[in-house]
Design a protein with these regions (language model features):
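Bacterial N-terminal signal peptides
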Residues: 2-12
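Bacterial Sec-dependent signal peptides at the C-terminal "C-region" and cleavage site
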Residues: 12-22
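Acidic Gly/Asp/Thr-rich repetitive segments characteristic of extracellular carbohydrate-active
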Residues: 26-58
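Extracellular beta-strand-rich solenoid/capping regions of secreted or surface-exposed proteins
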Residues: 44-51, 66-100, 109-128, 136-157, ...
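Tight coil/turn sites that cap or link beta-strands
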Residues: 62-63
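Acidic/polar low-complexity surface segments
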Residues: 69-85, 91, 136-241
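Conserved small/polar residues in nucleotide/adenosyl-binding loops
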Residues: 273-277
Length: 277
């Protein structure tokens, strides 16, 4: 019922928005609750309205908008250098012309497996003045606090919840969404770069045998495991499902003054893209 109400708010607001051309304000589709929980339905309704009236610009409200995958556009995508899957997309632009998304300094804070922007068959599009980040990274990491023959003891911060399932390590978020991993890479905690001569451990099963220690830490098990105590072990995401910007068959797209701090794939990927620049 709650999600239906959120979607209804966006549809009702469309009746209040401009009816032809000009600027459209996302605020007309939002209320305080949706901005703080899931602005996705409002964004979806606003973009649909913009396409229908051929608006020149969608202006975001500033501040922070939280966006979830629950009611986002669904689309199965094959994206070069990323992994195919059924995507959830926040800003889905198809066939739009001469259109701008003015972020107005807005921070878009995403939760879960969702792609921020997808543009298909679009021309003369500008996205400007916004920030993209995620509440949880797609990789996971923890500090190496002890080691031995064929094992490492890892202390994970609260940001990276984990448990043991069938004798193997599993990462999840507070809602239970699982974050698979497929490789381990040791990072120098001081220099904040891959450790000198670190081994890149690939995991064909997308997990690793593990056991929980009495102190709450996790001991991961593999014959050839080694690392320096005090360094950080990064558990790399198993797939690139959610690029920041996907541009397919587009012409003249400008991304200006955008801070992309994190995403679940490549930052910007262009397929069959042309530009006069």
């Amino acid at each position: 019922l709650h999600t239906l109400l959120l979607f209804a708010v966006g549809l009702f607001a469309a009746c209040q928005a401009p009816t032809s051309g000009g600027d459209v304000y996302l605020n007309d589709f939002l209320d305080d609750l949706t901005a703080q929980t899931d602005a996705g339905p409002a964004i979806r309704a606003a973009l649909s309205h913009c396409a229908r009236i051929r608006a020149a610009r969608l202006i975001l409200p500033g501040g922070e908008l939280r966006i979830r995958p629950d009611l986002a556009v669904e689309k199965y995508q094959f994206i070069s250098n990323n992994d195919e899957s059924l995507k959830r997309i926040a800003f889905d632009l198809v066939g739009m012309r001469d259109f701008e998304i003015d972020g107005n300094g807005t921070e878009l804070l995403f939760t879960g497996f969702i792609s921020p922007f997808s543009l298909e068959d679009c021309e003369n599009i500008t996205v400007r003045d916004l920030t993209i980040d995620f509440t949880r990274t797609f990789n996971s990491e923890g500090t190496v606090v002890a080691k031995g023959d064929g094992w490492l003891e890892i202390e994970f911060p609260e940001d990276y919840l984990c448990d043991i399932v069938n004798g193997c390590l599993r990462f999840r978020d507070a809602e239970g969404t699982v974050y698979p991993f497929s490789n381990l890479l040791e990072f120098d905690a001081v220099r904040r770069e891959p450790a000198f001569r670190a081994t890149d451990y690939w995991l064909s099963n997308r997990t690793i045998p593990a056991e929980k220690c009495a102190n709450g830490n996790i001991r991961i098990l593999r014959k050839d495991l080694t690392a320096t105590v005090g360094n950080v072990m990064v558990f790399g995401a198993a797939a690139r499902y959610n690029p920041g910007f996907t541009l397919a068959d587009c012409r003249g797209v400008a991304i200006r003054d955008v801070n992309l701090y994190h995403c679940g794939g490549m930052g910007v990927i262009c397929l069959l893209y042309t530009s006069d620049a």
